[in-house]
Amino acid sequence: MNKKKKINRTKVDTVRSVNNNIRSSVRKLNPILKAIVGKKVDVAIRELQFSAKRITREIRKTVSSAVANAENNNQYDIDKLIVKEAYCGKKVVMKRFRPRAKGRAAPILKPYSTITIILSEAKQMESHGSKS
């Protein structure tokens, strides 16, 4: 009867921000989140700002919150921050019903999701001499 230990995904050199209960499905969030992983924070925010998707506003707010956490809590340099991880998970699904013909009802599913953004500082590659 051992309790499962909670695994902390963040390391010491990372900063995270979580946005719970976003009114969108995981299927719609995943392509947007995969597009910003590995990019600098300012580039990721700019791409989200000019995207035509409705949900990018919520993702942009989460990335901005992670940047604020990095600046205030850990004193990281904003210009060196990159998006290390960005993933989403399922939350609750609200179930509603729409009346249809002949007394029937059709289900309407309204899924909710959670977004986690993890930032880290980009490591500078130092070159020691030339490669020959």
Curated annotation (Swiss-Prot):
MF term (GO), any: rRNA binding
PANTHER family according to UniProt: CHLOROPLAST 50S RIBOSOMAL PROTEIN L22-RELATED (PTHR13501), LARGE RIBOSOMAL SUBUNIT PROTEIN UL22M (PTHR13501:SF8)
Originating gene: rplV
Name of the protein: Large ribosomal subunit protein uL22
InterPro entries: Ribosomal_uL22, Ribosomal_uL22_bac/chlpt-type, Ribosomal_uL22_bac/org-type, Ribosomal_uL22_sf
Gene3D superfamilies: Ribosomal protein L22/L17
Function noted in UniProt: This protein binds specifically to 23S rRNA; its binding is stimulated by other ribosomal proteins, e.g. L4, L17, and L20. It is important during the early stages of 50S assembly. It makes multiple contacts with different domains of the 23S rRNA in the assembled 50S subunit and ribosome.
Keyword Ribonucleoprotein applies: yes
Signal sequence residues: none
Organism lineage string: Bacteria, Pseudomonadati, Pseudomonadota, Alphaproteobacteria, Candidatus Pelagibacterales
